[in-house]
Amino acid sequence: MIYHFTEEYDIIVIGAGHAGVEASLAASRMGCKVLLATINIEMLAFMPCNPSIGGSAKGIVVREVDALGGEMAKTIDKTYIQMKMLNTGKGPAVRALRAQADKELYSKEMRKTVENQENLTLRQTMIDEILVEDGKVVGVRTATHQEYAAKAVIVTTGTALRGEIIIGDLKYSSGPNHSLASINLADNLKELGLEIGRFKTGTPPRVKASSINYDVTEIQPGDEAPNHFSYTSRDEDYVKDQVPCWLTYTNGTSHEIIQNNLHRAPMFTGVVKGVGPRYCPSIEDKIVRFADKERHQLFLEPEGRNTEEVYVQGLSTSLPEDVQRDLVHSIKGLENAEMMRTGYAIEYDMVLPHQLRATLETKKISGLFTAGQTNGTSGYEEAAGQGIIAGINAALKIQGKPELILKRSDGYIGVMIDDLVTKGTIEPYRLLTSRAEYRLILRHDNADMRLTEMGREIGLVDDERWTRFEIKKNQFDNEMKRLDSIKLKPVKETNAKVEEMGFKPLTDAVTAKEFLRRPEVSYQDVVAFIGPAAEDLDDKIIELIETEIKYEGYISKAMDQVAKMKRMEEKRIPANIDWDDIDSIATEARQKFKLINPETIGQASRISGVNPADISILMVYLEGKNRSISKTLQKSK
């Protein structure tokens, strides 16, 4: 095939949502020449659904993206209108930050970053076709018949792939927020031999702030104590003048309106065929599935400082517009609310993720990567996490460097990608803390400790950031050593002070570290005995020290499990393995192995339907193969 390339790039990223911007920024910062193509340049890093970043598990992902050198955390720290630490009454493994965003300002701030990035070209154009020769990506073709050469292509199209918006009996071709749908590219991905699924998501109506009666709702303020997503943000820049959210509820009248109109609900009439998100169901789905519930929470979330639009979180729906209006007016505080936008469902094509490697490159086509909702996930944070990994690995592939694969013990991003490529997904995938078996070591307070060194090695962490990280790490290490070296003895003077502070007296000599391990003892209590550290420690380092010491036993057990799994991950499975050549494995295991083609014993062991006996047989088979290869090599000598 002869192509007429008018421009040449190392990497072309299709789609400028949260996955696309992270992918393009990472690759360009690693020295690649990148084109970021978007259907609508005004929607770069736009939030078509909830105006927030973070939340349970998701907030940790944002910090992981930041630790690797990504941009989401920095941008939300510049544009939030409220910041809140969730689950403060629970253990450290499930705590996470959540920010209400000024969604318009967030998009503008991210666009400024993209436009000013060296090696990165931003262009409004529709990509209709990915050009492939001999199983390798060579470029793309646009709707205006322009051909651009590329060594790698990253598809981050979100819900635009053959997108269709549904409101009642109205159904029309559209991407998110009524943008153009990408039809030809959806056809092209099928023609390239990729297996395609069909998912659905939805969004609630927006109401006018000045028409809400806030007096009958419950205020939900942000935190006064400073917190940030990015490790580069400063406490002195923390926004004090935050915008509150408000809590209200559905009621019996609301539920009756929905029940009386289920015959008009696309979810139940067969109009919606795509699979929806389990953990973010529509309000009509909730009313049917949880019929015993008298009410459901609804949060009224402002979409920014300079807009009247308020997002009604928890009221996602595709009911007809007249029913939505009645439903809104049945809710306390919204009796006279003006609906500014109608809620809708959107169906879209996605690439079944078992076809991907852990680098997010497709197994079928060399140089073709996918990330974000294209892979069947939901959420801006999940998209950003995949985007930065796809961008990094596309750049590393072009540069001939070793790939970056995050393990499940490295971060929630690693958990998510492993789940996708190993287990696949039959519904929009959402990250949850329960998905991570090592969640006690994958906390919000240690993402930089886990991943900054990786970011530095691949070239995404600059000298200033690295110096700050080294200072923090040294302060942490030095204080941990100090606490382990100083002893508190059960002498009269010490015990008098211990009892005065309300603690049980010492019976044996203990280190300061052991004393801090007591649940009721804080770091400041220990300092009262041993004096402060040589350097001033900020609250974040103190929090990290306390968590590491108080949960040391559990963390140690988790690290033992990580070591065992690492040994399994190091046992590679040949890419050309003949699964039919292995005797005695169960039929289901053989079928799953053929479908997913696991790359390591560890990955094979996590495939649903594969049992320990199948793994044992596989290991025996591989050991036999290795012995026979060794014998052949010895004979040839």
Swiss-Prot record:
Gene source species: Streptococcus pneumoniae (strain Hungary19A-6)
Similarity section: Belongs to the MnmG family.
Subcellular location: Cytoplasm
Domain of life, source organism: Bacteria
Entry GO terms, CC: cytosol
Subunit structure comment from the entry: Homodimer. Heterotetramer of two MnmE and two MnmG subunits.
Protein known as: tRNA uridine 5-carboxymethylaminomethyl modification enzyme MnmG
Function: NAD-binding protein involved in the addition of a carboxymethylaminomethyl (cmnm) group at the wobble position (U34) of certain tRNAs, forming tRNA-cmnm(5)s(2)U34.
Keywords for the protein's UniProt record, in alphabetical order: Cytoplasm, FAD, Flavoprotein, NAD, tRNA processing
Names of the cofactor(s): FAD
Disulfide linkage: none
PANTHER family: GLUCOSE INHIBITED DIVISION PROTEIN A (PTHR11806), PROTEIN MTO1 HOMOLOG, MITOCHONDRIAL (PTHR11806:SF0)
GO biological process: tRNA methylation; tRNA wobble uridine modification
Positions of FAD binding: G15, A16, G17, H18, A19, G20, I127, S182, Q373
MF terms (GO), sorted A to Z: flavin adenine dinucleotide binding
Cited Pfam families: GIDA, GIDA_C_1st, SAM_GIDA_C
Binding residue positions for NAD(+): 276-290
Main location: cytoplasm
Keyword set includes Flavoprotein: yes
Alphabetical list of InterPro entries matching this protein: FAD/NAD-bd_sf, GIDA_C_N, MnmG, MnmG-rel, MnmG-rel_CS, MnmG_C, MnmG_C_subdom, MnmG_C_subdom_sf
